[in-house]
Amino acid sequence: MSESARTDVVLVGAGIMSATLGAMLRRLEPDWSITLIERLDAVAAESSGPWNNAGTGHSALCELNYTPQRPDGSIDISKAVRINEEFQVTRQFWAYAAENGILNDVRSFLNPLPHVSFVHGAERVHQLRRRRDALAGNPLFAGAEWIDDPDEFARRLPLMAAKRVFSEPIALNWAADGTDVDFGALSRQLIGYCVRNGAVALFGQEVRNLVRQPDGGWMLTVVNRRTGEKRKLKTKFVFVGAGGNALSLLQRSGIKEINGFAGFPIGGRFLRTANPALTAAHRAKVYGVPAPGAPPLGALHLDLRYVNGKSWLMFGPFAGWSPKFLKRGHLRDLPGSIKPNNILSMVGVGVTQVTLLNYLIGQLRLSEPDRVAVLRKFVPSAADSDWELIVAGQRVQVIRRDKRKGGVLEFGTTVVGEADGSIAGLLGGSPGASTAVPIMLEVLQRCFTHRYQSWLPALKEMVPSLGANLSEEPVLYDEVRSWSSRALQLDAS
């Protein structure tokens, strides 16, 4: 890159979000110059890496926090439907990418795997049945099986049944059409496609500053983290897909839209094993009920994972805490993000989130034997020697200004950008990776309003259901579901 290079598009961060946007833009505008800048030395080395997230491919098939109970006792399925719709959109893009040479090794990142909700105790069994009944009429959730017989439980989940005393009611809601997703492998394929088709990927380089230019573009200061060399890069559009680092970069840009936003980092830890006897006895992702005070991403689950062709089991998450906004970030990340325009937002959250803080304190006090004791609620026969503790990625949850409370803590993803569309970034975490395509469609529509209409025919090739609500169009859902299953090799297993 020259001393003052130019490029049409800059993507900051080499995770699933930048990878998705880059691949979409390369299809829409093959002549545009695209430069990807990553501070680390590899693709998907932070939150998109397979050991930095659970790989569920969130589709709300098993995550109980997406179907809360209303005060009158009824079940609110609206969030589950929305998240599943978003995942179907992402799945369609993956199918299109597989058919058009963007993705060439589907099994390296996507494998069929049942998604299962697990509860015990009469009251929770009753609640799970009401959840199942509420979802049963929606085509997105059709076909789920109800299992409350201990013998069938043991046949489906032998590892969880071993040494279990079935002294109270248990129940499973079994969705056979779930998946396990390695977002790291997926990111590498998408970015590989971009680079093969003219994009430039810079690794070990960090964006330190963004300055608005008189012509509406941006001048970026890029620093080589190995040599300290500084370079300038001018661009028309910046996407900040830098995970936890997005907040600080958007703050440095000076756009007014970031005012009032803050971030609260929550780390994750998991127990992991590759013992073949254990992985062979658990072929599902099984989600339990979130603990009191736990954030939505804190529901315990026992997952089979496929990483680099090998089977693993992963149990957690157990919360950790660090002021870093990235797993390989800086201790100054959190204090450095506190500004006059967001300090009231942070104070407001500190006052109102006492339950969450107590949950985090309790999690930080857990010893290794304590964590294995929690694991035994899922795997009664678990032996300490089979499991190792790993540190997963950091999630920076969004704190947004609120007139009444000062600030509110949000769990999810938020697109923040300049009104003129010249810069946009993504804040927040779960279920971000698996809803990457709807989020990038939002970025395209918000940031390229003058081109979006002309892009629609191509976008509808990528996502045939674009503009439709699949939950209200069962025939269309069946069509795109069957097509994507074939393209993604999900109907042959």
UniProtKB/Swiss-Prot annotation:
Q: Which SUPFAM superfamilies match?
A: FAD/NAD(P)-binding domain
Q: Which Pfam families does the entry link to? A: Mqo
A Gene Ontology molecular-function term? 2-hydroxyglutarate dehydrogenase activity
Coiled coil located at which positions?
Answer: none
Q: In which pathway does it act?
A: Carbohydrate metabolism; tricarboxylic acid cycle; oxaloacetate from (S)-malate (quinone route): step 1/1
* EC number annotated for this UniProt entry: 1.1.5.4
Q: Which InterPro entries does this chain map to?
A: FAD/NAD-bd_sf (IPR036188), MQO (IPR006231)
Q: Which cofactor does it need?
A: FAD
What reaction gets catalysed by this protein? (S)-malate + a quinone = a quinol + oxaloacetate
Single biological process term from Gene Ontology: tricarboxylic acid cycle
Q: Which UniProt keywords apply?
A: FAD, Flavoprotein, Oxidoreductase, Tricarboxylic acid cycle
Do you know which PANTHER family this protein is assigned to?
L-2-HYDROXYGLUTARATE DEHYDROGENASE, MITOCHONDRIAL
- Could you tell me which HAMAP family the record lists for this protein? MQO (MF_00212)
Q: Would you identify the family this protein belongs to, as annotated?
A: Belongs to the MQO family.
| Name listed for the protein in its UniProt record | Probable malate:quinone oxidoreductase
Q: Which organism is it from?
A: Mycobacterium marinum (strain ATCC BAA-535 / M)
Q: Which gene encodes it?
A: mqo
